[in-house]
């Protein structure tokens, strides 16, 4: 079964919580609560409702960016973008029990995050995506192949999740580059039935 991370997104049709609930219903076991423009209070309110839903489905829940909140709410971990708290600092604050992921766009990013103690890397974007402002250079299949080859050469063993504008049809070719999983948002939420689409994608 595909290793799938669902990144929450608010649309005209669905709230952040509803988007996560549908992914869980479809069998996704890893939810990243991402509410970029929201206040910590708003994130906390949604996280408190989402945590028991994830627990009931035995799914991992990580927060995008909010390290202090992740510690307070005792979720599974955090994902840190390039402008968020440094991974080393987050590790000091959270200890070893929490999962810490980092965003990477280059092999240099990979080396830094690996040295700082990241548990996994979200590498991307695969292609242009509207869910992210200030997008880093697009990688495409060649970018993943190149970064993963450099990781192998440097003996850097850390799980890699491909992210950024990915649709279901891209998944087989992306997985062939050697990544460990895929992160999706719009590909699921834009489907006529997000629950069924999640199930379908997990079986690709």
UniProtKB/Swiss-Prot annotation:
It comes from the Bacteria. Mg(2+) binds at residues 65, 84. Pfam families: TMP-TENI. Its EC number is 2.5.1.3. Pathway: Cofactor biosynthesis; thiamine diphosphate biosynthesis; thiamine phosphate from 4-amino-2-methyl-5-diphosphomethylpyrimidine and 4-methyl-5-(2-phosphoethyl)-thiazole: step 1/1. This is Thiamine-phosphate synthase. Belongs to the thiamine-phosphate synthase family. GO terms for molecular function: magnesium ion binding; thiamine-phosphate diphosphorylase activity. 2-[(2R,5Z)-2-carboxy-4-methylthiazol-5(2H)-ylidene]ethyl phosphate binds at residues 129-131, 165. One of its GO terms (biological process) is thiamine biosynthetic process. Binds 1 Mg(2+) ion per subunit.
């Amino acid at each position: 079964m595909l290793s799938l991370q669902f990144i929450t997104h608010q649309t005209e049709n669905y709230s952040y919580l509803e988007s996560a609930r549908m992914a869980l219903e479809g069998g996704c076991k890893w939810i990243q609560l991402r509410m970029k423009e929201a206040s910590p209070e708003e994130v906390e309110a949604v996280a408190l409702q989402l945590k028991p839903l994830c627990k009931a489905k035995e799914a991992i829940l990580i927060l995008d960016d909010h390290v202090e909140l992740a510690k307070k709410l005792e979720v599974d971990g955090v994902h840190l973008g390039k402008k968020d708290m440094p991974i080393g600092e987050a590790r000091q604050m959270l200890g070893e029990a929490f999962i810490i992921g980092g965003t990477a766009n280059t092999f240099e990013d990979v080396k830094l995050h690996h040295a700082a103690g990241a548990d996994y890397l979200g590498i991307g974007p695969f292609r242009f995506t509207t869910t992210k402002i200030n997008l880093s250079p697009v990688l495409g299949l060649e970018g993943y192949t190149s970064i993963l080859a450099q990781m192998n050469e440097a003996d850097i063993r850390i799980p890699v999740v491909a992210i950024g504008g990915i649709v279901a049809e891209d998944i087989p070719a992306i997985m062939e580059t050697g990544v460990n999983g895929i992160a999706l948002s719009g590909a699921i939420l834009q489907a006529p039935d997000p629950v069924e689409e999640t199930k379908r994608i997990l079986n690709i």
